[in-house]
Regions:
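Basic, gly/Ser/Thr/Pro-rich low-complexity segments located predominantly at protein N termini
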Residues: 14-19, 24, 96-98, 116, ...
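DPxDG-like acidic metal-binding loop motif
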Residues: 92-116, 143-145
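ATP-binding N-lobe of GHMP and related small-molecule kinases
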Residues: 1-90, 108-112, 145
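Predominant activation on well-ordered alpha-helical scaffold segments within soluble catalytic domains
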Residues: 28, 62-66, 100-107, 120, ...
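Short, conserved acidic/polar surface loops in the N-terminal third of protein domains
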Residues: 90-94, 152-153
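Short, charged, solvent-exposed linker or helix-capping segments at domain edges/interfaces
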Residues: 38-43, 92, 160-161, 180-183
Length: 183
């Protein structure tokens, strides 16, 4: 199983460039090999789970897992189970955490795992499919942890650094939801 953290993005002047992984909340994504060369989502539980599709072609974890399998040329499929700890539409990277979790969980099953940067790209493609734009400011820190800076999207280049241990973050979440496409 993979634990994939909530993230903050669009920090200061770093629109679609800066991202920061939080310690919590987080999603947990479990993956297992299946003989059919497809991705299935067996279960989603947790806050807002009833609003999240189990269709792997429309779910960010399913799309990211498929992207990993295709990039690696895997000869098997993946069944996913998702435990949401991050409420959807909360503004702290819920779909990005699921995408990162799907990519990383599928990667654990490969005989030759992909590089971290490739996982970020697979997760960003899932975000593109669900939100409408290719951006890695949430999935980057969800995959890599820490603070990330995207140096370039073409060609893709991302850098990770540890934030200062003295840095504290307070996240306030109002009790209403905003879909990323509408934000």
């Amino acid at each position: 199983a993979v634990r994939s953290p909530a993230t903050l993005s669009n920090l200061g002047s770093g629109f679609d460039v800066f991202g920061l992984a939080l310690r919590e909340p987080y999603d947990v994504v479990e993956a297992r090999r299946i003989s059919d060369r497809k991705v299935v989502i067996e279960d989603i539980e947790g806050p807002g789970a009833s609003s999240i599709t189990t269709d792997p072609t429309r779910n960010s974890a399913g799309i990211a897992a498929r992207a990993v399998l295709e990039l690696a040329g895997a000869g098997f499929g993946v069944a996913l189970r998702i435990k949401k700890g991050i409420r959807p539409c909360s503004g702290i990277g819920s779909s990005g955490a699921s995408a990162a979790g799907g990519a990383c969980a599928a990667n654990l099953l490969l005989d030759r795992p992909l590089r971290s940067e490739e996982l970020v790209v697979c997760a960003a493609r899932a975000e593109q499919a669900t939100s409408g734009s290719f951006h890695a400011d949430n999935v980057g820190p969800a995959v890599l942890g820490g603070f990330t800076v995207i140096r370039s999207y073409e060609p893709f280049e991302i850098h990770r650094m540890d934030p200062p241990v003295e840095l504290g973050v307070v996240v306030t979440m109002p009790d209403f939801l905003v879909n990323t496409r509408e934000a």
